[in-house]
A protein has these predicted regions:
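Short beta->alpha connector loops at strand-helix junctions that form conserved
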Residues: 31, 72-73, 89-100, 177, ...
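Hydrophobic/small residue at the entry helix of a nucleotide-binding pocket
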Residues: 158
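N-terminal glycine-/charge-rich "phosphate-binding" loop or analogous flexible N-terminal tail
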Residues: 1-45, 174
């Protein structure tokens, strides 16, 4: 059994072990694989693991021995699943491994913005507190979350976990979701999109990326928001029109944004959000806590073992 990991570095930069995977067969782990290297490295593989390396129909057709593709992520749009299905190849993903970590990052951004953590750290490094005549140096008010309205777009596991944390802060939680009001706990109010954008103080994106949600947040939606509103995106970068968001931040249409994802990663140097006013960006790391990556590695092993036992789990091909 030949196993090849095409881009293992993101999930395991060296702090975790590949030994259990290597015990399942002849295993080669590459940190990164360029598109031109895929066919050579994947040749003869029965099991192929990828995080972001694209496996399109042409590539899949050129790997006749391939029986299983394991995506080391929840999203699997990098795989031509129709081509895999046609050739009888099992494709699995890693669901729900990072849910607590991503919800935690939502509030890392919210708290950084509302408590101005980065701002005050920067000012202290400049000596402004040292030179202050008062014991408490401040030059901008902080924002209390209790009583504020948060709108959550997409109430899957991460959206629901975000809602639970918000409830703990005493926030009023609104959700745009396909679930009926009867399926929601009483603390979460089902809200239509127009009302959510217009009335919520914070909006957090947790919906999947589809044709209907691409650039869901655009100039028209941003104009619906309050001037003191905050946008959080830990979901998918293309949910947001980036130029529209940069314009809205720079002209004061909304107050701030906290982003963990962008439409292109790594971003181009001319991405307008990199220099936008009150735009705080983390480099797609919400998923990457040590605990989350440990879960990812364990689910990866469980998926492969189930496949080898003839009882695949977490298959994305129905």
């Amino acid at each position: 059994m030949k196993i090849v990991v095409l881009d293992g570095y993101a999930a395991n930069p060296g702090d975790l072990s590949w030994d259990e995977l290597k015990s399942l067969g002849e295993c080669t782990v590459y940190d990164r694989t360029a598109p031109a290297e895929v066919l050579e490295r994947a040749a003869g593989a029965d099991i192929l693991m990828t995080n972001k390396v694209v496996l399109d129909a042409t590539t899949i057709a050129a790997l006749p021995q391939l029986k299983y593709i394991g995506v080391l992520a929840t999203g699997y749009n990098i795989i031509d699943t129709a081509a895999a299905k046609e050739r009888g190849i099992t494709v699995t993903n890693i669901p729900a491994y990072s849910t607590p970590s991503v919800a935690q990052m939502v509030f890392a951004h919210i708290l950084n913005i509302t408590q101005r953590v980065q701002h005050y750290t920067d000012e202290i490094h400049k000596g402004r507190w040292t030179n202050s005549p008062d014991f408490c140096f401040w030059d901008t008010p902080l924002i209390e979350l209790s009583g504020k309205k948060i709108g959550i777009i997409g109430l899957g596991q991460t959206g629901y976990n975000t809602a639970r944390i918000a409830i703990g802060f005493g926030m009023e939680v609104h959700a745009y979701t396909s679930k009926s009001p009867f399926q929601l706990p009483p603390e979460i109010k089902k809200t239509e999109l127009d009302e959510l954008f217009a009335n919520c103080d914070i909006i957090s994106l947790h919906c999947p990326l589809t044709d209907s949600t691409r650039e869901l947040v655009n100039a028209a939606r941003l104009k619906q928001m309050k001037p003191n509103a905050i946008l959080i995106n830990t979901g998918r970068g293309p949910l947001v029109n980036e130029q529209d968001l940069a314009d809205a931040l720079n002209n004061g249409t909304i107050f701030a944004a906290g982003l963990d994802v962008l439409s292109q990663e790594p971003p181009r140097a001319d991405n307008p959000l990199l220099t936008a006013r009150n735009c705080y960006i983390s480099p797609h790391i919400a998923w990457a806590s040590a605990a989350a990556r440990e879960r990812l590695m364990q689910i990866m092993l469980d998926n492969i073992k189930a496949f080898l036992d003839g009882k695949p789990i977490n298959s994305v091909i129905k």
